[in-house]
Design a protein with these regions (language model features):
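Catalytic core of non-heme Fe(II) oxygenases with the double-stranded beta-helix
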Residues: 52-163
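Non-heme Fe(II)/2-oxoglutarate
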Residues: 1-67, 71-73
């Protein structure tokens, strides 16, 4: 895997399993640092860990400093729902920081897109993902029809400013 290059991350069956998990779980209102102004959508935290070792190993092959992954998030977007331009970096007073962000398309919807500022990306297909730096501005646009569902993982490393 390389940063900013789409790749096949999940099989169709794995996407369907994550979709079923998300649809059968209680959804929360999406918030950023406790606020909902930047986004309007629904989320589910993916707490099953059966695939986590595989995902962690994938990130560690990219950078050995990766120690763990945060609980992944399943995000749901229907017409009128979106996540405006933002970054995934969190306050640097924590012992660990988000080192990489992975976003995967579980279900596409008409005109809904994941966009990275300063990068021209193709529309991701079901199971495709992209890995980028959390400091990169990105957003999820609203579908005009249907429901877009995405899956996000944050790979964590030590915050070197807290050593």
């Amino acid at each position: 895997m390389k940063l900013y290059e789409p790749f096949q991350f999940l099989t169709e069956e794995e996407c369907d399993q994550l979709l079923e998990y998300g649809r059968s779980s209680h959804k929360q209102t999406g918030k950023t640092l406790g606020k909902s102004a930047l986004r309007k959508n629904r989320i589910v935290w993916y707490r099953e860990s059966k695939w986590w070792p595989k995902w962690l190993m994938m990130f560690q092959k990219m950078d050995e400093s990766i120690e763990w992954i945060q609980d992944p998030q399943i995000s749901f977007y229907i017409p009128g729902e979106r996540y405006d331009w933002h970054v995934d970096t969190t306050p640097n007073h924590r012992t660990h920081i988000r080192h990489f962000t992975l976003t995967c398309e579980l279900q596409t919807a008409k005109n809904a897109r994941f966009e990275l500022q300063n990068y021209s990306l193709p529309k991701l297909k079901k199971g495709q993902a992209i890995i980028f730096k959390p400091s990169d501005m990105h957003r999820a646009t609203s579908p005009t029809f249907g429901e877009r569902v995405s899956f996000t993982i944050w790979a964590m490393s030590k915050n070197l400013t807290k050593s």
